[in-house]
Amino acid sequence: MGNLPSAAKHCLNYQQLLREHLWSGDSVAGALDAAQEASQLPGLPEYVKIVEVGPRDGLQNEKVIVPTDIKIELINQLSQTGLSVIEVTSFVSSRWVPQMADHAEVMRGIRQYPGVRYPVLTPNLQGFQHAVAAGATEIAVFGAASESFSKKNINCSIEESMGRFQEVISSARHMDIPVRGYVSCALGCPYEGSITPQKVTEVSKRLYGMGCYEISLGDTIGVGTPGSMKMMLESVMKEIPPGALAVHCHDTYGQALANILTALQMGINVVDSAVSGLGGCPYAKGASGNVATEDLIYMLNGMGLNTGVDLYKVMEAGEFICKAVNKTTNSKVAQASFNARLE
């Protein structure tokens, strides 16, 4: 190939490049170095809370049942990364979501680390009661902005779901158990197509009014763009303050990080993600996984935003679960790291 230019001879390999960009150490502890401070973009929150949904939303769509001990080990590994919220399981009927049939065993088996919250999903009062009996101290309810999706996902209309949620939330508040609310199909539905921002706002407002401390707005099938994200959030934020909102983006069309950046620029500072980009949706064929936690942290680190999460440790947890379920990671950052080790 002839003589290479001297600059090319000294080109950094992937591993060196990763070390330049995968910030940890002081940033994990909450302090930013000079380079990180210089990279901060104006108008963005200084801190972003990441809600890790891999053990629940990420694994629920796996066709092969993941052994309970693998789920427990994944959660325990994630608990040591600096993540403050890890959604661990769902107290739904095993007939509808067989992957979550071991919810009580998972709750009993995990080690609950100080400073980490472990919410679970509960679709109705019975699920809530089972969750509390298993030791849950925080729950979430999951509604939809699409009538068709609500009927497919939780087997009832939106109006009927609100009645169920009111029962759950009232019981939870009586026991001082915080409740998070999910709104699926916030940017599109696999059955109805486009969903109006007004519909998303209506459902979100009702959940917030019932007492949900935070509303997570989900792009369930990953069709959103920064433009549609902006329009939806502008509508919802007329009724709910940005500090009580989160975004939950799937990456079907490769728009998740762009959509998240849009949300951050609008004042949102809570983002859902899944280790290794695990996930999909059992009621939305073709939907790919959640935005990968590794890729999200990499982007946030690169903008000088603090998450308190150690990216290296998240990648280790991702490598563990991908080997356990015989999958290739969906995280671009993890893929780059793996390729670097092959050099």
Swiss-Prot record:
Keyword Endoplasmic reticulum in record: yes
Known cofactor(s): a divalent metal cation
Domain of life according to the entry: Eukaryota
Coiled coil regions in record: none
Binding site for a divalent metal cation: 57, 248, 250, 290
GO BP annotation list: ketone body biosynthetic process
GO (cellular component) term, any one: perinuclear region of cytoplasm
Ligand binding (substrate): 56
Catalytic-site annotation from UniProt: 281
SUPFAM superfamilies: Aldolase (SSF51569)
Lipid bilayer topology: Peripheral membrane protein
Pfam families: HMGL-like (PF00682)
Localization, UniProt: Cytoplasm, Cytosol; Endoplasmic reticulum membrane
Similarity annotation: Belongs to the HMG-CoA lyase family.
NCBIfam families reported in the protein's UniProt record: PRK05692.1
Described function: Non-mitochondrial 3-hydroxy-3-methylglutaryl-CoA lyase that catalyzes a cation-dependent cleavage of (S)-3-hydroxy-3-methylglutaryl-CoA into acetyl-CoA and acetoacetate, a key step in ketogenesis, the products of which support energy production in nonhepatic animal tissues.
Protein name as catalogued: 3-hydroxy-3-methylglutaryl-CoA lyase, cytoplasmic
Organism: Mus musculus
Lineage, broadest ranks: Eukaryota, Metazoa, Chordata, Craniata, Vertebrata
